[in-house]
């Protein structure tokens, strides 16, 4: 197959945030459509771009998949195919659960929900530009190439949905309250999130009450101690490390899977479609 090499850094223009750069969509779209000839097959890199100075930047988690979505959005592609080491988008991680199922066809909306809740195969950054232009996304296995994989596109969801289990181990649970036991207001939460952002806590779950604000997320052990010390300047802080976050999407009952039943429930949240547990 004849092809032509092109450096992604000449096409994908980003901000100066080197580890999780923001794409300058207008500049990127202009460069890609100025340079790319759609009659030629190109080979390029994923994960990287360049800032205005031409310095290399990276696109963050799942940046290579995101690169494919960027090219597709700019070129108004008919479809994006991403090759993985799994048979498609699974309803649970086989490292933690038996009898997993491939989600053969789901909507962009459901894929974004699963990604937000912690599903690890596809990041929401990849899905969003494809949804904006209604470009279908196919997830295929480079090991089982005859497998049809998963298809994410704009479809009407059936009423009977497959239950998905998302398990995130080694999280930290923080419970934060004011020193004078006054109510937790918006200004407190704003200050708390500013500290989270500065020190690097990735929040996966939040729960608010009148007197306390609890979050479950992931952070390194070293940064956790720094975070707690910073919060304790103005707040009372309690925390549990090495907790696990279980999310059940499209649940059919409220039972925790048997393999996790010996764990203590620290937090339980429930909506119409999703139930979440913080377990210890």
Which residues does each PLM region occupy?
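A conserved regulatory-domain signal marking ACT and ACT-like small-molecule sensing domains
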Residues: 148-280
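Generic hydrophobic/aromatic pocket-lining and core-packing "Φ" positions
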Residues: 68-69, 127, 193
